[in-house]
Amino acid sequence: MSVTKEQVIEFISNMTVLELSQFIKELEEKFGVSAAAPAVGMMMAAPTAASAEAEAEEKTEFDVILKEAGANKIAVIKVVRALTGLGLKEAKDKVDGAPSTLKEGVSKEDAEEAKKQLTEAGATVEVK
């Protein structure tokens, strides 16, 4: 009985990270190859605008930065409290100390939602 490619893929997809790491090491030893990318090619390639755009697209963690509170500071403080779970004094200190980072390492959806809420309250916000 021969094993199909689909069965191999299914088997590998059910492996844990540790098992997969050991599996890769065994394959490297058996075939005398390395799964690591060659460093020479990376050093020769100069960064271009296209690669910078691709890197920006691949980014998965974003920071929400309050640039300034705007005219309606009270509404912005309320939104900051709701987004961060901070107390009134801490939220006010964040708003008064702008520019300040409100959220770090959040998903793009969460960052955009926070930006939307803060902008609606009158704040100037940046997502990095």
UniProtKB/Swiss-Prot annotation:
CDD domains: Ribosomal_L7_L12
InterPro entries reported in the protein's UniProt record: Ribosomal_bL12, Ribosomal_bL12_C, Ribosomal_bL12_C/ClpS-like, Ribosomal_bL12_oligo, Ribosomal_bL12_oligo_N_sf
Role summary: Forms part of the ribosomal stalk which helps the ribosome interact with GTP-bound translation factors. Is thus essential for accurate translation.
Key words, A-Z: Ribonucleoprotein, Ribosomal protein
A Pfam short name: Ribosomal_L12
GO molecular function, one term: structural constituent of ribosome
Basic and acidic residues: compositionally biased ranges: 105-118
Protein family according to the UniProt entry: Belongs to the bacterial ribosomal protein bL12 family.
Region (Disordered): 97-128
Phylogenetic placement of the source organism: Bacteria, Pseudomonadati, Thermodesulfobacteriota, Desulfovibrionia, Desulfovibrionales
GO biological process, one term: translation
Cellular component GO terms held in the UniProt record: cytosolic large ribosomal subunit
Gene: rplL
Descriptive protein name: Large ribosomal subunit protein bL12
Native species: Lawsonia intracellularis (strain PHE/MN1-00)
Assembly notes: Homodimer. Part of the ribosomal stalk of the 50S ribosomal subunit. Forms a multimeric L10(L12)X complex, where L10 forms an elongated spine to which 2 to 4 L12 dimers bind in a sequential fashion. Binds GTP-bound translation factors.
